Swiss-Prot record:
Keywords: Cell wall biogenesis/degradation, Disulfide bond, Glycosidase, Hydrolase, Secreted, Signal, Zymogen. Belongs to the glycosyl hydrolase 5 (cellulase A) family. GO terms for molecular function: glucan exo-1,3-beta-glucosidase activity. It catalyses: Successive hydrolysis of beta-D-glucose units from the non-reducing ends of (1->3)-beta-D-glucans, releasing alpha-glucose. The lineage of its organism: Eukaryota, Fungi, Dikarya, Ascomycota, Saccharomycotina. InterPro entries: Glyco_hydro_5_CS, Glycoside_hydrolase_SF, Glycosyl_hydrolase_5. Its main location: secreted. GO terms for biological process: cell wall organization; glucan catabolic process. This is Glucan 1,3-beta-glucosidase. The keyword Disulfide bond applies. The active site is at residues 219, 318. Disulfide bonds join 301-423, 326-352. Residues 1-19 form the signal peptide.
Length: 425
């Protein structure tokens, strides 16, 4: 068969969706692939609450402003936290936090438990400030230290731009809650400049052995944004990283679009080493909370089946053990839980009292959480792997990988199954 006929056969082949990622891998090998997303599996964890504050992860930082049954004076995010403290006090408090929230021993324990990667969220303000920003800087020193620890303990890293100016989603984990100004003014261009800074430093040869992906932006709220403008941002962000010399994977988060939505975007041959990041949760609506455990597991299994069909390599960049939204401030400071009927006009499903502390979990709930975790692990093994959210939390056990492993709820080793073959893969 001559080359022209071969190319035509490939173009119209029904197996193209599977052959293209392989071609992508071959091209990457020639460019110096530092992670094989086609065959290797990420077993990773997020280091959330470190360089971008999240009240539900470290409520102790915010509790100084809390009163019994009154959160009205509590800052809702890092923007308002630093604004309330002022630059000098915020610098002092956050330096101590950056220095202590994750330490070298955490990385050592991650390796011990069988993890091979970490995803590190960080905000734009760590690299460049807007004139009016109350944020403080100093995070980069600790990010560099984290990369040294990751290298020492053979952990690969995704650097995840978790917050953009104006906020890309209005979530507290973007740094600025209840705002959606990412696509306004010069904010997109400013974000691209930040990505260029990240790419020039962490996409270079010094970090090729440890940084295997740079995420352009975490969880842009696609249903509320101009998706065409977002696609332009992704394209330019990709180009900025490649122009900086980076060969690492360029990660795009799915923007809350259905699986498969990005199949015809950033495709070969013009774009290479692109990975789609999916975040999977089932607790942020009343409809999800009312599902039976069997329904939860069916949904989780379908994530795996759907991921197998996608054009791009894909990874579950966030997921958790949560079957409730009972963790304090999970939905935001000043907001209750849907599960207990205290938020979002949700019906009452039950009291949160017994779900906050793992020691008081009903035995059936403990079993259900284990089943749910195992089903998700099975599903994400059909993809490029996973990053659990989060490595640790002060009081939110359903989101605390270290605590779940210690309690025997999360499989250890990860292939250990009490409920095998729930998905039938």
């Amino acid at each position: 068969m001559n080359l022209t006929l071969l190319l035509l056969a490939l173009i119209f082949s029904p197996s193209l969706i599977f052959s293209l990622p392989t071609a992508n891998k071959v091209k990457l090998v020639k460019k110096g692939l530092n992670w094989d997303y086609q065959n290797a599996k990420i077993h990773g964890v997020n280091l959330g609450g470190w360089f971008v504050l999240e009240p539900f992860i470290t409520p102790s930082l915010f509790d100084i402003y809390s009163k019994p049954n009154d959160d009205s004076q509590v800052p809702v995010d890092e923007y308002h936290f630093t604004q309330k403290l002022g630059k000098d006090a915020a610098q002092q408090v956050l330096e101590q936090h950056w220095k202590t929230w994750y330490k070298e021993n955490d990385f050592k324990m991650m390796l011990k438990y069988g993890l091979n990667a970490v995803r590190i969220p960080i905000g734009y303000w760590a690299f460049k400030l807007l004139d009016y920003d109350p944020y403080v800087q100093g995070q980069v020193k600790y990010l560099d230290r984290a990369l040294d620890w990751a290298r020492k303990y053979n952990l690969k890293v995704w650097i995840d731009l978790h917050g953009a100016p104006g906020s890309q989603n209005g979530f507290d984990n973007s740094g600025l809650r209840d705002s959606l100004g990412f696509q306004q003014g010069n904010n997109v261009n400013f974000t691209l400049e930040v990505l260029e800074i990240i790419g020039k430093k962490y996409g270079g040869p010094e970090y090729e052995d440890v940084v295997i992906g740079i995420e352009l932006l975490n969880e842009p709220l696609g249903p509320s944004l101009d998706l065409n403008y977002l696609k332009e941002f992704f394209q330019q962000g990709y180009q900025n990283l490649r122009n900086s010399g980076s060969v690492q994977a360029v990660i795009i988060q799915d923007a809350f679009q259905p699986m498969g939505y990005w199949d015809n975007f950033l495709t070969l041959d013009q774009y290479w080493n692109v990975v789609v990041d999916h975040h999977h949760y089932q607790v942020f609506s009343a409809g999800e909370l009312q599902r039976s455990i069997d329904d939860h597991i069916t949904v989780a299994c379908n994530w795996g089946w759907d991921a197998k069909k996608e054009y791009h390599w894909n990874v579950a960049g966030e997921w958790s053990a949560a079957l409730t939204d009972c963790a304090r401030w999970l939905n935001g400071v000043g907001r209750g839980a849907r599960f207990s009927g205290d938020f979002d006009n949700s019906p009452y499903f039950g009291s949160c009292d017994c779900y906050v502390n793992i020691a008081t979990w009903p035995s059936e709930y403990r079993t259900n959480v284990r089943r749910y975790i195992e089903a998700q692990l099975d599903a994400f093994e059909q993809t490029g792997g996973w990053f659990f959210w989060n490595w640790k939390c002060e009081n939110a056990i359903e989101w605390d990988l270290q605590g779940l492993i210690t309690a025997g709820v999360f499989p250890y080793p990860f292939y250990n199954r009490q409920f095998p073959n729930q998905c039938g893969f």
